[in-house]
């Protein structure tokens, strides 16, 4: 009978999962000026960005240097941003996590009036040995339009049973 008390790789996978989860927790709980160092959680050629946009194409920031520049822009445009109601979900892959959360704060985009932005988000994190390889953010773009005082068209969905 084979020994199944410690399958090969089981302990290592759990340790890796916990290491990666700690990185995701740190990313999601980083606030204020500390956001200027969040790029340090990424691998050198890591990327992050917004996968739901008004254009239909993602905005992808590639590489630690560009992620650092993005942090400066983000702090200027979302000065008091915070994620809350954070729920982190592991997957069968110790290097992949999903996060469901809410976020809120001022939105200061040049050319638009100052607004207050609230939305519901999903994040996909792909990691490598405790560092983020790719972070994809998904949200309801209409909520951002509303926060910027941009009129949102209404879709008629006649007949939907609710």
From Swiss-Prot:
Q: Which gene encodes it?
A: phzB1
Q: How does it assemble?
A: Homodimer.
Q: Which GO terms describe its biological process?
A: phenazine biosynthetic process
On induction, the UniProt comment says: Under control of LasR. In liquid cultures (aerobic), phz1 operon is induced by quinolone signal via 2-heptyl-3-hydroxy-4-quinolone (PQS). In biofilm (microaerobic), phz1 operon is not induced by PQS, because the biosynthesis of PQS by the monooxygenase PqsH requires molecular oxygen.
Pathway listed for it is: Antibiotic biosynthesis; phenazine biosynthesis
Family under the similarity heading: Belongs to the PhzA/PhzB family.
Report what the protein is called: Phenazine biosynthesis protein PhzB1
Q: What does this protein do?
A: Involved in the biosynthesis of the antibiotic phenazine, a nitrogen-containing heterocyclic molecule. PhzB1 (operon phzA1B1C1E1F1G1) has a role in the biosynthesis of the phenazine during planktonic growth.
Q: Which InterPro entries match?
A: NTF2-like_dom_sf (IPR032710), PhzA_PhzB (IPR004964)
Keyword Transmembrane helix on entry = no
Under Pfam families, the record lists: PHZA_PHZB
Keywords, A to Z, come to: Antibiotic biosynthesis
């Amino acid at each position: 009978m084979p020994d199944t008390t410690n399958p090969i790789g089981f302990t290592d996978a759990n340790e890796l999962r916990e290491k990666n989860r700690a990185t995701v927790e740190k990313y999601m709980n980083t606030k204020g000026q500390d956001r200027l160092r969040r790029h340090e959680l990424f691998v050198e050629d890591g990327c992050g960005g917004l996968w739901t946009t008004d254009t239909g194409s993602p905005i992808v920031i590639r590489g630690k240097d560009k992620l650092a520049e993005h942090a400066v822009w983000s702090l200027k445009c979302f000065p008091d941003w915070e994620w809350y109601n954070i729920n982190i979900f592991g997957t069968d892959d110790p290097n992949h996590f999903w996060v469901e959360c809410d976020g809120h704060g001022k939105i200061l985009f040049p050319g638009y009036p100052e607004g207050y932005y609230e939305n519901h988000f999903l994040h996909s994190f792909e990691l490598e040995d405790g560092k983020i390889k790719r972070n994809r953010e998904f949200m309801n773009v209409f909520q951002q339009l509303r926060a910027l005082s941009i009129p949102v068209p209404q879709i008629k969905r006649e007949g939907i049973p609710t």
